[in-house]
């Protein structure tokens, strides 16, 4: 069973951090495997809007994108993803950001064009296995007002601690979030 600490806090105020809550669960007869931190390590990856997207001369797949990343002047980013288009909201790693795989973003020339960041897929951010193209965020913001320039983890509520609990046969009552909240209360 995976218990989201943030979701749990919608039901109760645990009064302790996720690690201590895990120890309390263990004392109550549940077996805590681990506490996994999610959404951290994405500093410098922001919500951005692709303003323009033009094919790069001499390439069959590269595009030069002008991107509003909330940093004042628009960024110019060379992107090879097949699904990039003008008007999209995307995840943009700005110069200096270090992605979960340890890759640090820097200004780089590609085919003679300066790229000032990287438009990222979910796999590059360590969030999912999808590497088919960049992560398009259109539709994630219900009111239509996207927080351009905001860290992606904060904007999408990705920062959480997940308690991974191995349920024993005598604790099937904790197969649901409400009973996990009751156990923590």
Regions from the language model: what does each represent?
Residues 1-185:
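Phosphate-backbone binding interfaces of nucleic-acid-interacting proteins
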């Amino acid at each position: 069973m995976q218990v989201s600490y943030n979701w749990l806090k919608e039901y109760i105020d645990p009064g302790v951090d996720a690690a201590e809550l895990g120890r309390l669960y263990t004392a109550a007869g549940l077996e805590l495997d681990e506490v996994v931190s999610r959404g951290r390590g994405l500093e410098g990856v922001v919500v951005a809007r692709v303003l323009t997207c033009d094919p790069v001369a001499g390439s069959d797949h590269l595009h030069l994108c002008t991107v509003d990343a909330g940093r004042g002047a628009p960024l110019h980013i060379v992107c090879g993803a097949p699904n990039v288009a003008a008007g999209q909201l995307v995840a943009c790693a700005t110069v200096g950001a270090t992605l979960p795989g340890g890759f640090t973003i820097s200004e780089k020339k590609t085919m003679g064009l300066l790229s000032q960041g990287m438009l990222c897929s979910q796999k590059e951010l360590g969030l999912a296995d999808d590497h088919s193209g960049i992560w398009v965020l259109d539709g994630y913001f219900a009111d239509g007002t996207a927080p351009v320039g905001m860290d992606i983890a904060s904007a999408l509520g990705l920062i959480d601690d997940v308690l991974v609990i191995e349920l024993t046969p005598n604790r099937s009552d904790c197969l649901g979030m409400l009973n996990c909240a009751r156990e923590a209360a």
